[in-house]
UniProtKB/Swiss-Prot annotation:
Protein's GO biological process: 'de novo' pyrimidine nucleobase biosynthetic process; 'de novo' UMP biosynthetic process; amino acid metabolic process
Catalyses which reaction(s): carbamoyl phosphate + L-aspartate = N-carbamoyl-L-aspartate + phosphate + H(+)
General function of this protein: Catalyzes the condensation of carbamoyl phosphate and aspartate to form carbamoyl aspartate and inorganic phosphate, the committed step in the de novo pyrimidine nucleotide biosynthesis pathway.
Gene giving rise to this polypeptide: pyrB
Pfam family, any one: OTCace
Residues reported to bind carbamoyl phosphate: 58-59, 108, 136, 139, 265-266
Name of the protein: Aspartate carbamoyltransferase catalytic subunit
Keywords (A to Z) from UniProt: Pyrimidine biosynthesis, Transferase
A GO-annotated cellular component: cytosol
Enzyme class: transferase
Length: 313
């Protein structure tokens, strides 16, 4: 359990204390990653099934790595090699996999709400690895962990989220999590890529990039979600990059020296971020990847019923 939750589906559901429970445990899990032998017996005998209906590099590999470091058995499943191609429903697929008695189902799906639907029909814990444009809770948690690690705290800090906010499940999870930890959130991007009503979550909305990043402690750059966009919402990527992309000159002129830059990946280099910025000293993007393993270890440990404090060592 994570606090009162059997599942990890949306950070909208999580309290400040429940978010901190995960990222505090992730500190211990990250220590395991620094060891020469990266293996602990915490989840020995447990099974984690990864169901991915959408392409993924970081998230699927991260959950698989997290499970294996904790000594759980990990089964990776993709829709292209399953009976879904023969017309089997999502719920039937989940029920059949649950019959194999996994402890955790990790699911990524193009439809918002798919993980919650699965959770209503299975008895094991369900973790959302991203559902449509709804949420990506483990990414939101690893962003919280990374920011706290780099900034010391999120209390009183300002985070700018820039790009295609409307179609970003990462942005939604961050929006639900950051204010609970005391951070102020600024959203920036084309008006056509800004969802209505985000102000109710405590964010301020900007269309001017310089204004949005002025004085920010961290900037999270988002890619354009072409796969979720129907009619074009911007004139073109070149024009987008000129206005909302972050290059070395803008970073040097507009960001305060201590500001860090994050990106959930994959990066469209030369569009939202120039290579110089993505690979530069401000970038903590690869830290996010490593922290993602630690955070997902914490999630799996809490949901699968880890074997106690001694098993972490």
């Amino acid at each position: 359990m994570i606090g009162r939750h059997k599942h990890c589906i949306a950070l909208e559901d999580f309290s400040r204390e429940e978010i901190l429970e995960v990222i505090d445990l992730a500190v211990s899990m990250k220590e395991v990653l620094q060891r020469p032998i990266k293996k602990v017996p915490s989840l020995r005998g447990k099974m984690v099934v990864n169901l991915f209906f959408e392409a993924s590099t970081r998230t699927r590999s991260s959950f698989e790595t997290a499970a294996k470091i904790l000594s759980a058995d990990a089964l990776n499943w993709t829709s292209s090699s399953s009976s879904v191609t023969k017309g089997e429903t999502l719920v039937d697929t989940a029920k059949n996999l649950e019959a194999m008695r996994p402890d955790v189902l990790v699911i990524r799906h193009s439809a918002g709400g798919a993980p919650r639907l699965v959770a209503e029909h299975v008895g094991c814990s369900v973790v959302s690895a991203g559902d449509g444009a709804h949420e990506h809770p483990s990414q939101g948690l690893l962003d919280c962990f990374t920011l706290r690690e780099k900034l010391g705290t999120l209390e009183g800090k300002t985070v700018a989220i820039v790009g295609d906010v409307s179609h970003s499940r990462v942005a939604r999870s961050d929006l639900h999590a950051f204010p609970k930890l005391g951070a102020k959130v600024r959203l920036c991007g084309p008006p056509t890529m800004m969802p209505a009503g985000v102000e109710r979550l405590g964010a301020t909305v900007h269309t001017d990039l310089r204004e949005a990043v002025d004085g920010a402690d961290a900037v999270i750059m988002l890619r354009i979600q072409h796969e979720r966009i129907g009619d074009p919402l911007i004139p073109g990527t070149r024009e987008y990059s000129k206005v909302w992309g972050l290059n070395a000159k803008k970073a040097a002129d507009w960001l305060k020296p201590s500001c860090v830059i994050l990106h959930p990946g994959p990066i469209n280099r030369g569009v939202e971020l120039s290579p110089e910025v993505a690979d530069g000293p401000r970038s903590v993007i690869l830290d996010q990847v490593q922290n993602g393993v630690a955070v997902r270890m914490a999630i799996l440990y809490l949901l699968a019923g880890g074997a106690g404090e001694e098993a972490r060592a």
